[in-house]
């Protein structure tokens, strides 16, 4: 019965007698896998696997040298692939031949388990693979009784304990254990001409006891416990005569099919035996490996591929081939089966030794087009807004969980199976609908129409005096940082007020109701306009008197110097409210944009008044844009003063605007009044950025008015003040311009004025297109590539690696495998399950190998080695990335802006913050 068990019979679990289990003691996993071969890896206990009855029949046919006869009954209820739970794995070795085989206990999944949206995490530990070993095929001299075993010099120095070369000749005694725990003693000596490593005394006894012949292989392993292990791997010799006590080939085929069909119909456990040396291919593979190959890789006829094969002395080599067809191996008995469904043609002349058909999970296509993104729940490139339905009213769980598995039309079991964690179909991702946020799809067209309807109301740039550069050299700049913070405080309160109303206004408000509310608030604001004008005139007169008295104290040469430096400054009305540009409506229709965005008559401003709060005299375009701004003017673009040395970014930004800000009481009083009458407008109703920041920017610094036409209105790019939601028009190439935002003033006030948590998360709208970049953003983008890159792996210390030493991904993977003891596993992630990911300069986590090599070298920040368990655990959102030391989600404006600027990527709809391993 021993041969029948090892050759692949199927037994019910309850019928597994003690005779079938030859050894109760646990075998060494390293030695067992070394004897099985470098391409063999048993699935972990507790994991989900896919069992192929076709492959099991091939093992029986290879062991008995007899194919399955046609008269064997068919089992229509047995699917071509059976998804099972692996309950137990026992490694065995034949006591006489040392032939290794494994006993597996499987149980088909129930219909309820097939509907689980997530693949459970693998609880069992992976079988240990050998790392420090060598294998040699025996020659005729190695098996002779009067000779010894010649060990290659490099292998002896790598595996055997070091010799004492002070002795003559250097020699030592080695004690090695085989699979059954038997100890074998050998004398290791370094002698001969030329000198070589030999095993002499005890070797002939071992060869005779194991009945080794030329062509068999012997392998030695030095494990972590400083023990020497010994194993053998016999050459494949087909048996010509089968023992009479062994079951016939037909009986074995019928037995395995009947047991599998019974287990599939009753959801009962059954036991199989897997012989890795006799089976042509693995017929029990992990479910994740099967899904990745079948549903995540698209192949076609004519595509080139490569496949791993075992060669002499336990080495591995890739052979190239071409896909010549895709069809069922046995369409009559096993329709719609993925077992050996790919016809291939091999390049080399020795192709006759290889199978003409292979399975999808055995090959590695050279040019692959993934059907889904990579199986990692990374960050979304475009975060989904908070509070909105995912797919126009669909359930959020349908998108936050991963996409349901692609259905198999021929298998009812696969039709109900959902596979989670392997990404989202790109064409299934939701398209953002502006109507959900209360935005009109033709908002830009409406604004353009209002600007061209009445050419007489188009204002010349000369009328917009607050946009023109003014000579303010005679004004004193005595504002302190505390005064600046007090000025910004009302703006921040107003912004926070609008953010709080966003959640209640964004749901259930129709567009007509929103416009009517705007109209009512605009009218109430217009009624308060005379009072604001009276206060403005009083404050202007007081400000003029103070400025005249202060100018008398400033030396004349300082005034000239200030006048020279400040000539190019743009005058900025820092306290302008989004609704300060509105006047009385000229029409009464609440459904037209002209009612909400009326025209105002041009007025002139005094030269000494920089930031008046009277109704603005801006162009129609400004009147149209300002009411839709969701925050106070905070993004200013202005030159940096060259006469004042500043040591830090805060000082540079403070000094740059100190001379342009009005006095504190004026701004504070005006903003308090505006804050009390601030209309309740959803923040999400702000206009999206105008396409292309460079289209309105004169990069050469020229002030050609024709280059600044916006909807028929001349706009000077150097003096234009852009409110929140519109990018700065300052030229990017201007070295004296600094990006300026409210976050730079609010950094000391983070504890007193925290941002709304909805903005602090990564689930809010992506404003990377219209939120100005922070001051250090250009430094990050233009930063030179680092020479040394940190490499991380769970359970080990991180290593620094100079990636400039390598010229290809293959060299990098090979070096990483050597550093972390993963030789041969990082080169083929499809088979081993180990994955390499890296974090680029923009904090995106990407797969190593997807980009051109030079682009990868220039953008890599750090590298992370993920084990197969980590790859499978990443199928659940936040599970692995949240455990990594990442950037903490703060509540400051700087953190918010930097998060919005960072690009994000994810396969699931759930988004996380910036990731740093």
UniProtKB/Swiss-Prot annotation:
Single biological process term from Gene Ontology: auxin-activated signaling pathway
Protein origin, superkingdom: Eukaryota
Positions of the PB1 domain: 786-870
MF GO annotations: DNA binding
Short name of one Pfam family: ARF_AD
Keyword DNA-binding: yes
Annotated Low complexity bias: 576-594, 604-620
Entry GO CC: nucleus
Ranges annotated as DNA-binding: 134-236
SMART domains: B3
Disordered: annotated span: 571-649
InterPro entries from the UniProt entry: ARF_dom, ARF_plant, AUX/IAA_dom, B3_DNA-bd, DNA-bd_pseudobarrel_sf, PB1-like
Cell location: Nucleus
UniProt keyword terms in alphabetical order: Auxin signaling pathway, DNA-binding, Nucleus, Transcription, Transcription regulation
Alphabetized PANTHER family for the sequence: AUXIN RESPONSE FACTOR 17, AUXIN RESPONSE FACTOR 4-RELATED
Family of this protein: Belongs to the ARF family.
Function: Auxin response factors (ARFs) are transcriptional factors that bind specifically to the DNA sequence 5'-TGTCTC-3' found in the auxin-responsive promoter elements (AuxREs).
Assembly: Homodimers and heterodimers.
Domain notes for this protein: Interactions between auxin response factors (ARFs) and Aux/IAA proteins occur through their C-terminal dimerization domains III and IV.
Protein's name in the database: Auxin response factor 17
Organism: Oryza sativa subsp. indica
Gene behind this protein: ARF17
């Amino acid at each position: 019965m021993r041969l029948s068990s090892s050759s692949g019979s199927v037994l019910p679990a309850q019928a597994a007698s003690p005779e079938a289990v030859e050894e109760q003691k646990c075998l060494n996993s390293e030695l067992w896998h070394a004897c099985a071969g470098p391409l063999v890896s048993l699935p972990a206990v507790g994991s989900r696997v896919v069992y192929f009855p076709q492959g099991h029949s091939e093992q029986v046919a290879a062991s008995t040298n007899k194919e399955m006869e046609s008269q064997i009954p068919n089992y229509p209820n047995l699917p071509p692939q059976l998804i099972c739970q692996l309950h137990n794995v026992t490694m065995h070795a034949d006591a006489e031949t040392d032939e290794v085989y494994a006993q597996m206990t499987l149980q088909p999944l129930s219909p309820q388990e097939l509907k689980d949206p997530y693949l459970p995490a693998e609880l069992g530990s992976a079988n240990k693979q050998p790392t420090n070993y060598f294998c040699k095929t025996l020659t005729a001299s190695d098996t002779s009784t009067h000779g010894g075993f010649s060990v290659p010099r490099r292998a002896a120095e790598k595996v055997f304990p070091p010799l004492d070369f002070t002795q003559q000749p250097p020699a030592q005694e080695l004690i090695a254990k085989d699979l059954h725990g038997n100890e074998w003693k050998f004398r290791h000596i370094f002698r001969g001409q030329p000198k070589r490593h030999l095993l002499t005394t005890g070797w002939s006894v071992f060869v005779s006891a194991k009945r080794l012949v030329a062509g068999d292989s012997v392998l030695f392993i030095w494990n972590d416990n400083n023990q020497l292990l010994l194993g053998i791997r016999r050459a494949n010799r087909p048996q010509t005569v089968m023992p009479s006590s062994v079951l016939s080939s037909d009986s074995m085929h019928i037995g395995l099919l009947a047991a599998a069909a019974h287990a599939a119909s009753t959801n009962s456990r059954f036991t199989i035996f897997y012989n890795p040396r006799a089976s042509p291919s693995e017929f029990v593979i992990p479910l994740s490996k099967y899904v990745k190959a079948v549903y995540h890789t698209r192949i076609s006829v004519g595509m080139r591929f490569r496949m791993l094969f075992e060669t002499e002395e336990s080495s591995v080599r890739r052979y190239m081939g071409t896909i010549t067809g895709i069809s069922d191996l046995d369409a009559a008995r096993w329709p719609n089966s993925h077992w050996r469904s790919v016809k291939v043609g091999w390049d080399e002349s020795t192709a006759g030794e290889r199978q003409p058909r292979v399975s999808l999970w055995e090959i590695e296509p050279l040019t692959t087009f993934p059907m889904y993104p990579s199986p990692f729940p990374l960050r979304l490139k475009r975060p989904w807004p908070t509070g909105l339905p995912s797919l126009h009213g669909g359930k959020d769980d349908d998108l936050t969980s991963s996409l349901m598995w692609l259905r198999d039309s021929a298998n009812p079991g696969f039709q109900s199976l959902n596979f989670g964690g392997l990404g989202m179909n790109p064409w299934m991702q939701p398209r953002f609908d502006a109507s959900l946020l209360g935005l009109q799809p033709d908002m830009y067209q409406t604004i353009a129409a209002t600007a061209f309807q009445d050419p007489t109301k188009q204002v010349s740039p000369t009328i917009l005096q607050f946009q023109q550069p003014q000579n303010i050299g005679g004004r004193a700049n005595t504002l302190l940082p505390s005064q600046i913070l007090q000025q910004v405080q009302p703006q921040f309160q107003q912004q926070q007020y609008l953010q709080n109303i966003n959640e209640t206004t964004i749901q259930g408000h129709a567009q007509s109701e929103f416009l009517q509310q705007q109209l009512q608030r605009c009218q109430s604001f217009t009624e308060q306009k005379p009072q604001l004008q009276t206060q403005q005139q009083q404050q202007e007169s007081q400000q003029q008197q103070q400025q005249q008295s202060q100018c008398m104290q400033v030396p004349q040469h300082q005034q000239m110097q200030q006048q020279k430096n400040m000539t190019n400054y743009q005058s900025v009305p820092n306290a302008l409210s989004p609704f300060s540009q509105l006047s009385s409506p000229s029409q009464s229709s609440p459904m037209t944009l002209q009612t909400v965005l009326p025209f105002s008559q041009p007025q002139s401003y005094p030269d000494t008044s920089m930031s008046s709060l009277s109704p603005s005299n801006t162009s129609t375009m400004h009147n149209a844009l300002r009411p839709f701004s969701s925050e106070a003017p905070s993004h200013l673009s202005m030159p940096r003063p060259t006469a004042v040395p500043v040591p830090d970014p805060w000082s540079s930004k403070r000094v740059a605007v100190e001379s342009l800000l009005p006095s504190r009481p004026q701004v504070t009083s005006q903003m308090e009044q505006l804050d009390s009458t601030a209309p309740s407008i959803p923040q999400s109703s702000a206009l999206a950025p105008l396409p292309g920041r460079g289209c309105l920017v004169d990069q050469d610094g020229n002030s050609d008015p024709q280059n600044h036409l916006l909807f028929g209105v001349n706009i000077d790019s150097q003096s234009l003040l852009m409110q929140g939601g519109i990018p700065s028009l300052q030229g990017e190439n201007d070295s004296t311009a600094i990006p300026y935002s409210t976050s730079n003033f609010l950094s000391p006030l983070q504890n007193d004025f925290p941002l709304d948590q909805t903005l602090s998360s990564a689930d809010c709208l992506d404003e990377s297109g219209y939120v100005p970049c922070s001051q250090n953003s250009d430094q990050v983008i233009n930063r030179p590539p680092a020479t040394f890159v940190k490499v991380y792996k769970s359970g080990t210390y991180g290593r620094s690696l100079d990636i400039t030493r390598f010229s290809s991904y293959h060299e990098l993977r090979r070096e990483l495998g050597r550093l972390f003891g993963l030789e041969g596993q990082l080169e083929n992630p499809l088979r081993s399950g180990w994955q390499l990911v890296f974090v680029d300069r923009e904090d995106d986590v990407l797969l190593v190998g997807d980009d051109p090599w030079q682009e990868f070298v220039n953008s890599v920040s750090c590298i992370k080695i993920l084990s197969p368990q980590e790859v499978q655990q990443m199928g659940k959102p936040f599970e692995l990335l949240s455990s990594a030391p990442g950037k903490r989600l703060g509540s400051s404006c700087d953190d918010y802006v930097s998060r919005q600027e960072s690009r994000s990527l994810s396969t699931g709809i759930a988004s996380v913050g910036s990731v740093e391993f």
